[in-house]
Amino acid sequence: MRKRISAIINKLNISIIIMTVVLMIGCGQQPEAGKTGVSGGVNGNLGNSLMELGRSAENAFYAFIELVSDVLGFTAKSDTTKQEVGGYFNSLGAKLGEASNDLEQVAVKAETGVDKSDSSKNPIREAVNEAKEVLGTLKGYVESLGTIGDSNPVGYANNAAGSGTTAADDELRKAFKALQEIVKAATDAGVKALKIGATTLQANGGADNKEGAKILATSGGNPAAADVAKAAAILSSVSGEEMLSSIVKSGENDAQLAAAADGNTSAISFAKGGSDAHLAGANTPKAAAVAGGIALRSLVKTGKLAAGAADNATGGGKEVQGVGVAAANKLLRAVEDVIKKTVKNVLEKAKEKIDKARGSQEPVSESSK
């Protein structure tokens, strides 16, 4: 009998322990009061997240990521048009505008009951205005990128063996200016400078892939069928960050190639093209510059890549377009990453100033929040 009672007690103890663990896990999964389970922001609102005194600035950034989650991660495909990429940029710009509006509400609440003549001296208003200025800059240039395309597919390529077409000059300038200003806004906000690509067209002393640059030819001969694989190899040797760095370090007025490319040839010059002989004249050009040129040609109005064979053959238009799409996506991810890092830094700075201002104030009652 004692053994049976002891066994029953042991089972009860085990059951109680299991129930306790389950309850603890369940409680741990519940969002804290005033927070959402995903973003960490109050009701998923960016402005409310910034007003959570003592909370990490990460909460505000998560609220921003939640706000733009239906836009981030856009990936171009073979049937994606350049205008559809523009739609992505316009949507991202609109989300940056929404974030700015959320921030404005923080300042409006901070000014409630305050003499408006002193509003310019309100530290919360100042913090919000500084953050909004950066978001406004990003929004403007992101939306500018929304206007650089046309109805042709991303990576548009010649459907037969033949040269390509340079990107429209006005739209190429607009793309260059927008990317340059987005990166400038990032570095001004404390984001680490972009990595500069040092890899040449003969990566690590290996295969010489200079003929891959011929898919950017706009005159002379067209690339050979085997050259397209070399273009893909050039692209795979660099990161999107290195491509973006090469583009923004170009000169707005860099010209189409009139002589053999070298280590100083910019992404803008490669995007504008030239003869196949000049494009593939040496293996010293930077791979990031060639890849950046391919990405720009693939995204900007009237840009068309050269092909080495009939559309569906090896080295033909479809294969070339695949390289163009991959280059475009690498660049898009890099731009998106820069924007996210910039917003994160801006929100951290605003949060720090807002917390400092609120910490020096009298506690605010729940009814007045």
UniProtKB/Swiss-Prot annotation:
A lipid is attached at residue 27 (S-diacylglycerol cysteine). Its main location: membrane. The keyword Signal applies. It is found in: Cell outer membrane. It is a lipid-anchor. Keywords: Cell outer membrane, Lipoprotein, Membrane, Palmitate, Plasmid, Signal. GO terms for cellular component: cell outer membrane. Disulfide bonds: none annotated. The keyword Signal applies. Residues 1-26 form the signal peptide. A lipid is attached at residue 27 (N-palmitoyl cysteine). Belongs to the variable large protein (Vlp) family. Alpha subfamily. The Vlp and Vsp proteins are antigenically distinct proteins, only one vlp or vsp gene is transcriptionally active at any one time. Switching between these genes is a mechanism of host immune response evasion. Genes for both Vlp and Vsp families are on (usually) unnamed linear plasmids in B.hermsii HS1. This is Variable large protein 7. It comes from Borrelia hermsii.
